[in-house]
Amino acid sequence: MTTDMQPIHALLLQTLQEHRFATSHQLTRLTMHRYGNRRSAIRQTSRHLRELHRQHYLVRLERRIGGWQGGSGVSIWTLSTKGVRHLSGGSRRVRPHHHTTTFLHHSLAVTETRVTLHEAARQFHRDLEVQVEPHCWRRHLDGHGAAITLKPDLAATVTGDEYVDRYFIEVDRDTENPARVITKCWRYLQHQRSGEEQRKQGVYPAVVWLVPHESRKQQIATAIASEPGLPKDLFTVTTMAELHLLVRDGPAPNT
């Protein structure tokens, strides 16, 4: 990365390198603590994004996606080929317009999770560390010695005055049958039983299924509770609206 780039420009590029896609609103919220007020944050972030776009570091996707700012036209930002090469030093080309709406939905939901975690950590005066893909992935050996990669969407560590909470986070968009969720739960249990994470961190993280609404929460919680052999205290199901409570209070039992 060139040394003459503004720190805020470098931060915006790094965020998009980690998450691939983010809306203007998400990027504003993520950097809002750098500004005096919300209006200034919106104005300054928009200016920085326009400048990075003018310099061809970013691509703006204008798509109408329901659930993001009321389904209106949303400015979705991603790195251009120049932006990717600037950060990586490689020669890879990118084709951001080739991604499906389903993929964009999930990517934006993961970005939203990251932003909400940071907002809650600042609100409740917690220290927060977030790992994104692929850094949050975990490798271990199964019972036959074959290598397996567990792929959470995020890993997070929340540190308060007297505790440390660790999480693997699965961002659910209510697009999969609950049976596939249960299959992923068994993969987490297999990873827990390998002991790899406990040897490195001392404890195994709580697995959080982050869902879009209350009815999906009840559906997934019921599926987990009904599955024989799954340790119920390993999994927490919560909605995006409740995510700040996870940062403040830690994992709550499923009800």
For the regions a language model picked out, list residue spans one by one.
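Amphipathic alpha-helical dimerization/coiled-coil segments
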Residues: 85-131
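Active-site metal-binding core of divalent-cation-utilizing nuclease and nuclease-like domains
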Residues: 61, 103, 122-167, 176-186
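Core beta-strand-centered patch of the WYL/Sm-like small regulatory domain
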Residues: 104-111, 115, 119, 162-198, ...
